[in-house]
Amino acid sequence: MTRYIFVTGGVVSSLGKGIASASLAAILEARGLKITMLKLDPYINVDPGTMSPFQHGEVFVTQDGAETDLDLGHYERFVRTTMTQNNNFTTGRVYMDVLRKERRGDYLGATVQVIPHITDEIKRRIIKGAGDADVALVEIGGTVGDIESQPFLEAIRQLRVEIGAKRAMLMHLTLVPYIATAGETKTKPTQHSVKELRSIGLQPDVLVCRSDHPIDVSSRRKIALFTNVEERAVIALEDVDTIYRIPSVLHAQGLDDIVVERFGLECGQADLSEWDRVVDAKLNPEREVTIAMVGKYMELLDAYKSLIEAMTHAGIQSRTKVNLRYIDSEDIEQQGTSLLEGVDAILVPGGFGLRGVEGKISTVQYARENKIPYLGICLGMQVAVIEYARNVLGWSDANSTEFDKSSGHPVVGLITEWQDATGATEIRTEASDLGGTMRLGAQECQLQTGTLVHDCYAKDVIVERHRHRYEVNNNLLPQLEQAGLKISGRSGDGALVEVVEAPEHPWFVACQFHPEFTSTPRDGHPLFSGFVNAALKYSGKA
């Protein structure tokens, strides 16, 4: 029988509800419990797939091909549970499903309202997403008091009553600001945030108080008194040197004991030695490298959240401090490749649209001609193919049809047909909707023996996640291969190019898939580990 921990946030947004939830989940998992996590997003978009990275940050792709909130990336990095499309849903998705049922006549002519129809659909999705887990942590996006969050909070209130207090807890994150002129932390914002929650029928069981300064015992006692929360359930969570320390911080304050006692669960003690190892390797590196990351969304680094974390994980595995030099590809176009001087490796991540593409192509040329280790991901592979066609084959007009539909040598084009993660055939044209029409989710890839990528994975067949609608044009592939471009990975059916490598280069790998989505701090990822090792070798520190 599943128990539920509902996680809300107050005072301000971006307090780290996702990381706090994932950290608690990691402790409970370490105690031997089966864990799952859900993220409920209050926005009207059906999913974040077509939202600007500048507004929403990264779109995290699940194993089954769902385009979801970046918090699901945090979940998968902290726990071993694999997330699916059931672990994230939005207001838009809920309303779409309810309206579809109304059109079918499922409500038998009833007046469709927020209560009960919308709240019932939210509750149904929460229960479905929880599955057979021992504990499901359910994070509600936004801040208490937001008008968009009201249906979700009402659904939680109802669900707590329906399943009973012994199966439901509410954990509320708040901000306890430090006022430098007064020299003290202030509890009033937390008091008001809890008052707002209680006004809609929700009493927190646990308060996680975020602060950039220590919260003393008297402040915690005051918070407990005014919010009707046990003093030991007022958890102080200061800023830390690495997010992977947070499980230990929460465990030291007994948060997992509070949960286990409340739910009456029988389980062992938490073994956090894996997390201790991660923190030690992260904070005590033995060497360091500098890697240039050339992208087009550098104003909001959350657009590359999983990728940045994957580079950190690779550093943890080899006890290497990975210094990322963030470079906007438009700056390369305006200032030239001198911005890349002095780096030990170059990384070009994915992206959409024409802006900044020529800067990425110049970056690839610089890496290839100067024998600097290069890793291209998604668009980073496509620009590698375009660069090779232009500067090795001499096709000066080579391009992708995404950027130039009249190109005489469209070496990258729209995929018109493929199989999705379920095995069903998908067909797309230029006129297809942008939302939900890409090649998404886990796909098999066959690796060629004797290649760099095969050396990294040490496998003939791998499974990685995809998010793209353009691919290498098979009609021009023979000329590319004849000119030396190495095709080191193909889709499971052999129809699509998945990985390319440049000849006569110490380490040049470009892949169509997104390996960052499966990298974790405890296990790392073979491709990123190979990339960092290549950077170490290039710098002479291997």
Swiss-Prot record:
Keywords: ATP-binding, Glutamine amidotransferase, Ligase, Magnesium, Metal-binding, Nucleotide-binding, Pyrimidine biosynthesis. Pathway: Pyrimidine metabolism; CTP biosynthesis via de novo pathway; CTP from UDP: step 2/2. The keyword Nucleotide-binding applies. The active site is at C378 (nucleophile), H514, E516. It comes from the Bacteria. Mg(2+) binds at D71, E139. Allosterically activated by GTP, when glutamine is the substrate; GTP has no effect on the reaction when ammonia is the substrate. The allosteric effector GTP functions by stabilizing the protein conformation that binds the tetrahedral intermediate(s) formed during glutamine hydrolysis. Inhibited by the product CTP, via allosteric rather than competitive inhibition. CTP binds at S13, D146, I147, E148, K186, T187, K188, P189, T190, Q191, K222. It is an enzyme of class 6 (ligase). PANTHER family: CTP SYNTHASE, CTP SYNTHASE-RELATED. This is CTP synthase. It comes from Pseudomonas aeruginosa (strain ATCC 15692 / DSM 22644 / CIP 104116 / JCM 14847 / LMG 12228 / 1C / PRS 101 / PAO1). The gene is pyrG.
